[in-house]
Each structure stands twice: as structure tokens, then as C-alpha cells.
Amino acid sequence: MSKIEFLREQIIEARNFVNRLVSELPEDLWFVIPENTDSNFAWQIGHLIVAQNFHAITVITGLNEKVKQVIPLAQYNKQFNGMGTLHRSIKEDVVTASVLKSQLDAVHEICIENLSGLSDDILYTPLEPIPFRHPVAENKYEALSWCFKHEMWHSAEVEEIKRRLGYPIIWMNK
């Protein structure tokens, strides 16, 4: 297995974990901010959409036209960006849970399709140009590696939100 294939598989596995969490919480609870937290399920999912686009598409191969057709990129970057944001929740009048689910799947499909056409040769090349310094990566390998690690980090937050809303932790293999 090549390094790019390994990274792609890790991104797929992390998303499978997120998809399990998504399937376990009713959509009517996605916008509730549990007591003693600052976030809701919907914001976390929106954040994962823009993060995967950023870490695994934009800085790897540049802005992707397919992504722009699926999500309002500029709006979502403002609403769901996690770097220094003061708000980690979103209201239902902005976007519905079903739309977020669909967009989560669509951006992931674009990501995997995009990565499937790449080889290990690109991994240690500089990131595609962006107007600010990438928060953790200097090259494409580091960005792709961070993508799945970041997704698993937020899986823990999503799991805690879900638990605080009365839906217990369910491990993958019972």
C-alpha cells in the first residue's frame, strides 16, 4: 500500500466513525447546545465539512469547483471555521440537519475521488497557496495526516455532545 493510499484509507475510516455518530442522534437534537458545553452537533458536522475540504482538498490540489457547487464555501468558512472562532454552534434557520448530512457525504466523496488520482510524489511538496499560514502543515503529507487526526478529535467532541443529549456511547463492535 502506498502512503497516499494509507492516508486515504485513514480519512475513510475516520469518516466511517463520524457517520456512525451521525446515525445515532435524531436530527431534531442537532441544534441543541447541551448544558455546560459551547457547541452543538450541527456546528461540529459543518466544521468537519469545511475542515475536510481545507485539509484534504484545497491545500492539496487547490480550490475545487465541485465543492463550490455542493456548499456555499465562503459562508461556511465563516460559520464553521474553528480557528479562533467565538461561536461553535449554529441555528437551524441557517441550514438543516438533512442538508448538512448530504453535504458531509458529498464533500467526502469529492475528497476521496480527488485523492484517488494522486500519487506519493505529491506528498512532500508544498501546500497549494492559501492566504494565511496553515495551522499545522508545511507539506501535503502533513495536511492529509492532520485531516483524519482532526476528524477523530472532533469525533470525541461529537460523542460527548451526543452523550450529554441522552444518547450513550455505543462502541463499534458490540
Question: What residue spans do the PLM features occupy?
Answer:
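N-terminal export signals and maturation junctions of secreted/periplasmic proteins
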Residues: M1-E5
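Short, contiguous alpha-helical
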Residues: R8-I12, N19, L29-M83, E128-K174
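A non-catalytic, amphipathic alpha-helix used as a structural packing/dimerization or gating element
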Residues: E9-F17, S102-A106, I110-E113, W153
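A generic alpha-helix structural signal
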Residues: V22, I45, K101-L104
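Short secondary-structure junctions
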Residues: E24-P26
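Acidic/histidine-rich alpha-helical segments that form the ligand environment
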Residues: N81-T125, E142-C147
